[in-house]
């Protein structure tokens, strides 16, 4: 086995790093502060570019058996017979997976853990909370707490994939500049046949109401209903179950309450580290950058970070490149985070939450013209599927 790498965080980005490093013959230890893998639906969209990346390890095949393939998705105006449909067949020549896969992110992390659990090069420490960290010239020393004990260890390289509230980032005192979007996002998971209430629904739907918005996405027999508080709503009160029922009844009225399986709310940030590499400490995923979830790019971009990080780390581990080779990982993925992921997700955030009638008319006309024009349709989907960001990443030296 090769050099040892420690990864902080067992989310999608961290475990994808672990998967690809172990497959390449390296020893990996993953520290996860929680005792189990979370099973919420914070992210549920796998874009074509991500499915292509996961194909080689067999993970995509596993996920396909657990999710819903969405080949066509749409914008709708609730209560009006108006829709704009985008068809991923337009980019079938650029991907092996011309569809979005709607499946919970924990299906990915569970699949990777199952794949690696008996591998001698993989060690997952649950309930292990990072408590100290010191980067050196040849190693990274760290301390973690588990089962009431304080344990010291070291690795040749440490990957911080521990999320938006990264402990690694805080221990190192790194600035995480950016801003908070003005509206929270509230997500409900329901076991209800919305397709019977609105027969024109597709697997992914972005919907304007007269004075607000919601999105509705299908994951097998479940639906994920997301919205933001209205302007006049108290944002805290909007997050309780009573307010959620009121929002559901406003768009899909019925004579009894909905059964809500999950209710989650998220504060939305747009932030980015100044550098994704600090010596032998590397950052990826939400620990490195945050963006609006509009368009489903957050988890996907974290997985893309992981692929790019491993691609640059492997030749360094093999002695075929110097440590400076990893600076290109920083340049590539930081540029993509700022110029592609944050730009597109912020545009989606504004588009979905626009309420001014005149500005809505302009947006709607532009989307309709885009969908109707073959080249613009394809161009739009290359961006939204994240295939273009992967292409642009490879053009950055």
Located regions from the model:
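Conserved hydrophobic helix-helix packing surfaces used for dimerization/oligomerization
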Residues: 5-7, 28, 281
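Conserved mid-domain beta->alpha element of the FAD-binding
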Residues: 9-19, 23, 112, 160, ...
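Active-site-adjacent segment of FAD-dependent monooxygenases/related oxidoreductases
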Residues: 42, 47-115, 341
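Conserved FAD-binding catalytic core of PHBH/FMO-like flavoproteins
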Residues: 114, 140, 149, 157, ...
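A conserved short coil-to-beta-strand element within the FAD-binding core of flavoproteins
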Residues: 126-140
